[in-house]
Amino acid sequence: MSTVDFGRVITAMVTPFHPDMSVNYTQAKKLSRYLVENGSDGLVVSGTTGESPTLNKDEKIQLFKAVVEEVGGQATVIAGTGSYDTASSIILTKEAEKVGCDGVMLVAPYYNKPSQEGLYQHFRTIAECTSLPVMLYNIPGRTGINVLPATVERLAKDVPNIVAIKEAAGDINQVSELRRILPEDFIIFSGDDSLTLPMLSLGCKGIVSVAAHIAGKQIQEMIDAFTSGNTTLAANLHKELFPIFKGLFITSNPVPVKAALNLKGLAVGGVRLPLVEATAKEIETVKNIMNNLHLL
């Protein structure tokens, strides 16, 4: 098992776009710097929040390079290299290693709905093509397939560089089973901001976060409070942050968080089709939540 330290607060970084919807690599560097200076221990580049399905391979590689150049060595840079195509994921994973990423995150294959054996073979085959540590990513609400705890247990046992999972099934029972059966040094991250504190109580490490774009320092404070034994403070911070945790999902992610970043003057641009811009009402909702929490 790898001793890699991904950190506790990892931001699933948005991908900035120019007005013509080309990738704004300069702004990606600026955003990565901002996030690291405001509570992020690491960054996932080209994950769900980074609109990976609408980025091509070359764009993803250039994003990996840009973020590594800006914050490599200061924060963990994790490349989102998973897809529904094992062969393509292998190619992208090798490129991520070449440009200096610290790890890769592999989302469960979406759309083609493999069996648990297919999931096992998919993840194992990709992981064996690289020396980088691998984080699995289970998000059945988007992929249509649930990576079951028994499958994760097999992978943890059989593939040394599969060292972590981002668990976003939204099921505390599943998290409990994962923590019960997995080795103690296998890292579990919450994939839902609103479940970070409950999952910490089950022995999970931290969060791969959307809200850390806006409230990274506050999320770090919540985790600090919990790990130091001040569970009352941690619970109070969780309750305080809960409106932003939920507010950033009033429509499809990353539409609200991009609106929030633009409100803060971070100029990340819009979203690529088939996603569409936040409505005026949605922007106002996000703005009000941010104002109430003094995040603007």
UniProtKB/Swiss-Prot annotation:
Protein biosynthesis keyword on record: no
Positions that bind pyruvate: T49, V208
Keyword Aminoacyl-tRNA synthetase listed: no
Catalyses which reaction(s): L-aspartate 4-semialdehyde + pyruvate = (2S,4S)-4-hydroxy-2,3,4,5-tetrahydrodipicolinate + H2O + H(+)
GO MF, any single term: 4-hydroxy-tetrahydrodipicolinate synthase activity
GO cellular component labels: cytosol
Keyword tags: Amino-acid biosynthesis, Cytoplasm, Diaminopimelate biosynthesis, Lyase, Lysine biosynthesis, Schiff base
Top-level lineage group: Bacteria
Localization per Swiss-Prot or TrEMBL: Cytoplasm
PROSITE patterns on file: DHDPS_1, DHDPS_2
Signal sequence region: none
SUPFAM superfamilies named among the record's database cross-references: Aldolase
Its job: Catalyzes the condensation of (S)-aspartate-beta-semialdehyde [(S)-ASA] and pyruvate to 4-hydroxy-tetrahydrodipicolinate (HTPA).
Subunit annotation: Homotetramer; dimer of dimers.
Name recorded for this polypeptide: 4-hydroxy-tetrahydrodipicolinate synthase
Naturally occurring in which organism (per UniProt): Desulforamulus reducens (strain ATCC BAA-1160 / DSM 100696 / MI-1) (Desulfotomaculum reducens)
The organism's taxonomic lineage, starting at the top: Bacteria, Bacillati, Bacillota, Clostridia, Eubacteriales
